[in-house]
C-alpha cells in the first residue's frame, strides 16, 4: 500500500492524479482542495473508500497543519508521496510583457504576489507541513508540478514574454526543490519539479480562451517542438507523470524534468 497526497486536486491535473491513483484500491489517496469539492471529485470520492477529500488552502499555514494531522491519523503518521499541484495563473494583466508594467508598479506587485502566495510560498508551506509524514513514509518523494514557463531555455527559444508572475514563481520553486533535495538527501528523501506538458485542462483553456489564441500558442510552442500538433489529454499527461514519479532516482532528485523524464517540455 502506498499513500499519496495531492494539493489542488479538485479539477484538472490534480483531480486526474487522484482519479488514477485511487483506481488502485491498495493506494491511500488524499485529495487536498481549497474549498468545496468539484462535482466530479465529490462523485468519484463517494464511490472509492481509499480516496479522502480534505480541505487545505495552501495560503493558510494553520489549515495545512490541520490537514497534515488528518492525513497522519489515517496513515499511521506517514506519507509516501506528496504532490504540490495547486497553482495560481496570474491576474488580469498576466498577458502583459515585463516592460509594459512601467507606470503600473502597483499592478506588477499584485501580479507577482498573487502567484507567489500560491506557487511559491504556498508550495513551501505545504511541503513543510507534510514533511514529517514523508520522513516516516517508505517511498519518501516530494513532487512539485512546475511548467515549461519556468525554464529559461524554453522561454528564450519560444520567445515567451508574458505570464511574468506565473513564470518567475515556477522558476523560483524549481530552485527551492533543489534546495530541498540537498537538505533531505541524507534522509533518503527525493524531490522533483515535474512539468506536465501542454495539457488540455480548464486552466489551459482559460489562458487560451479562443481558437485563435490557442493557434497562436501552438505556433509559439512549435518553435521548441516543431512536430507539436496540439494539447495533450490530461489522462495521458498524468499517466506519463506517474511513470516519471515511480521511476525517480536519487541521481534525478532536485532536477526539473518533463513528463517524458527529460528536458523535452512539450
From Swiss-Prot:
Loss of function: phenotype: Abolishes the production of arthripenoids but leads to the accumulation of a new compound that has a keto group at position C4.
SUPFAM superfamilies associated with the record: NAD(P)-binding Rossmann-fold domains (SSF51735)
E.C. code: 1.1.1.-
Keywords recorded for this protein, A-Z: NADP, Oxidoreductase
CDD domains per UniProt: carb_red_sniffer_like_SDR_c
GO biological process, one term: terpenoid biosynthetic process
Organism, scientific name: Arthrinium sp
Chain residues that bind NADP(+): 13, 57, 85, 166, 170, 199, 201
Keyword NADP: yes
Family label: Belongs to the short-chain dehydrogenases/reductases (SDR) family.
Official protein name in the record: Short-chain dehydrogenase/reductase atnB
Amino acid at each position: 500500500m502506498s499513500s499519496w497526497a495531492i494539493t489542488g486536486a479538485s479539477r484538472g491535473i490534480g483531480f486526474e492524479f487522484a482519479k488514477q491513483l485511487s483506481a488502485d484500491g491498495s493506494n491511500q489517496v488524499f485529495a487536498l482542495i481549497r474549498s468545496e469539492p468539484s462535482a466530479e471529485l465529490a462523485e468519484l470520492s463517494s464511490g472509492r473508500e481509499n480516496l479522502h477529500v480534505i480541505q487545505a488552502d495552501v495560503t493558510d499555514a494553520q489549515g495545512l497543519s490541520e490537514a497534515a494531522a488528518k492525513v497522519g491519523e489515517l496513515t499511521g503518521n506517514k506519507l509516501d508521496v506528496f504532490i504540490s499541484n495547486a497553482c495560481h495563473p496570474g491576474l488580469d494583466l498576466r498577458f502583459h510583457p515585463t516592460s509594459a508594467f512601467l507606470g503600473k508598479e502597483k499592478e506588477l506587485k499584485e501580479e507577482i504576489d498573487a502567484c507567489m502566495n500560491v506557487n511559491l510560498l504556498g508550495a513551501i508551506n505545504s511541503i513543510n507541513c507534510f514533511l514529517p509524514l514523508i520522513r516516516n513514509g517508505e517511498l519518501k518523494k516530494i513532487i512539485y508540478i512546475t511548467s515549461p514557463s519556468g525554464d529559461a531555455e524554453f522561454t528564450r527559444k519560444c520567445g515567451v514574454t508574458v505570464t511574468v508572475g506565473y513564470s518567475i514563481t515556477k522558476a523560483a520553486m524549481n530552485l527551492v526543490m533543489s534546495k530541498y533535495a540537498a537538505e533531505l538527501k541524507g534522509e533518503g528523501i527525493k524531490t522533483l519539479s515535474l512539468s506536465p506538458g501542454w495539457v488540455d485542462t480548464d486552466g489551459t483553456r482559460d489562458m487560451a480562451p479562443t481558437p485563435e489564441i490557442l493557434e497562436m500558442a501552438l505556433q509559439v510552442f512549435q518553435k521548441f517542438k516543431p512536430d507539436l500538433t496540439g494539447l495533450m489529454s490530461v489522462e495521458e499527461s498524468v499517466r506519463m507523470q506517474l511513470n516519471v514519479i515511480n521511476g525517480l532516482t536519487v541521481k534525478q532528485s532536485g532536477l526539473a524534468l518533463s513528463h517524458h523524464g527529460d528536458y523535452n517540455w512539450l
